[in-house]
From Swiss-Prot:
Gene name linked to the record: rpsT
Keyword Ribosomal protein set for record: yes
Biological role: Binds directly to 16S ribosomal RNA.
Pfam families: Ribosomal_S20p (PF01649)
Protein name: Small ribosomal subunit protein bS20
PANTHER family on file: 30S RIBOSOMAL PROTEIN S20, SMALL RIBOSOMAL SUBUNIT PROTEIN BS20C
NCBIfam families named among the record's database cross-references: S20
Amino acid sequence: MANSPQAKKRIRRNDRRAEVNTARMSRIRSFVKKVETAVAEGDKKAAEAALKEAQPEMARGVARGVIHKNTAARKFSRLTKRVASL
């Protein structure tokens, strides 16, 4: 258990940051899911539109330290390849 005031504050801050990061990751997953759903349905226009929305969302996740840049690049590359194959 944290005893010092600083350690208690760090716990509070960590909890707040974890909540924000969880929300950001959830948002990224939702955008990626939209692309995957459109690809599964074979709707190229919807897939391209969803991909255009998902890319900046992943970039924001990278900028804010939620996901690693290589992870975002890999996900975007794979999504792009799947959309292009339609």
